[in-house]
């Protein structure tokens, strides 16, 4: 015997060294089931300072509303946190004065 317990325990009888269990995963390897998202989007309002977020412009705000009438999240729209808050506030104001619908009818 080599000093180890000889029963068929957790490792099914395989003879592993202790260092095999404490190994850190390879951080450069792609995780299975995850997709690469490509390039990070740049906030259009930070890139072009001439663009303004206005609640009275429903055509510009429709880009940030989904088909069901929900506000599109930052990770999809590409806005920075500051401009996403302003877009959300503008959408809510436009809904209150009936420039944008609260829900989309089928």
Curated annotation (Swiss-Prot):
One example of a Gene Ontology biological process annotation: translation
Annotated GO CC locations: cytosolic small ribosomal subunit
Entry-linked PROSITE patterns: RIBOSOMAL_S18
SUPFAM superfamilies recorded: Ribosomal protein S18
Chain intervals for the UniProt region annotation (Disordered): 1-39
Coiled coil residues, start to end: none
UniProt xrefs under Pfam families: Ribosomal_S18
Keywords, comma-separated and alphabetical: Ribonucleoprotein, Ribosomal protein, RNA-binding, rRNA-binding
One of the record's GO molecular function terms: structural constituent of ribosome
Cross-referenced Gene3D superfamilies: Ribosomal protein S18
Family to which this protein belongs: Belongs to the bacterial ribosomal protein bS18 family.
Function: Binds as a heterodimer with protein bS6 to the central domain of the 16S rRNA, where it helps stabilize the platform of the 30S subunit.
Assembly and oligomerization: Part of the 30S ribosomal subunit. Forms a tight heterodimer with protein bS6.
Protein name: Small ribosomal subunit protein bS18
Source species: Sorangium cellulosum (strain So ce56) (Polyangium cellulosum (strain So ce56))
